[in-house]
Amino acid sequence: REGITCDVSWEYIKRKLREKAVKVVESQIYLFGKQQFQLFTMKDEVDVIITDSPILLNSVYDKSNCPLLKALILNEYNKYDNLLYLIERDPSVTYEQEGRYQDLEGAKAVDNHLKQFLSDNEIEYKTINGIGGENLELIFKEIKAKLNK
């Protein structure tokens, strides 16, 4: 749209969970590498990469709380010119368990952990309610402004 090229970096873990590869959840280093490689291969090919699984989540999900992994993730994240949006959960929408390894309460706990992580690391983000038309237009305008288009 309007001369902006984009692609989607799909959530790698979701594919693995559909394959019943549950053990992979325990290795955030592996998952980070897979997700980061997708971004790396796309970054020079398109203007915009859209993802529902930013690499920051690997630090949020890292049960070992490894400071070296966190530093690496933040370093890689900061190599990109990011716009980060947190989409608030709509209580009227049923939570889909398929392709996820936590239930709704677990997902809400991750939401809170993510917000704390972003705050602790002074990472800018915007919160939006849903991904409907108005919010899509807002995001698109912000992308255009960032790209000077």
Language-model features, listed with the residues they occupy:
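Conserved substrate/cofactor phosphate-moiety recognition/catalytic segment
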Residues: R1-Q38
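Hydrophobic "anchor" residues on beta-strands that sit immediately upstream
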Residues: D7, V48, L84
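Active-site flanking residues adjacent to catalytic metal/cofactor-binding acidic residues
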Residues: W10, T51-S53, I87
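Anionic, Ser/Thr-rich low-complexity intrinsically disordered regions
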Residues: K16-E19, N65, F140
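Glycine-rich phosphate-binding loop used to anchor ATP phosphates in small-molecule kinases
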Residues: Y30-K79, T94
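Short, amphipathic alpha-helical "lid/cap" segments that border enzyme active or binding sites
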Residues: F32, Q36, L136-F140, K144
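A glycine- and Lys/Arg-enriched "phosphate-lid" helix/loop adjacent to the NTP-binding pocket
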Residues: N65-E134, L138
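C-terminal accessory "lid"/substrate-recognition subdomains
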Residues: E124-K126, F140-K149
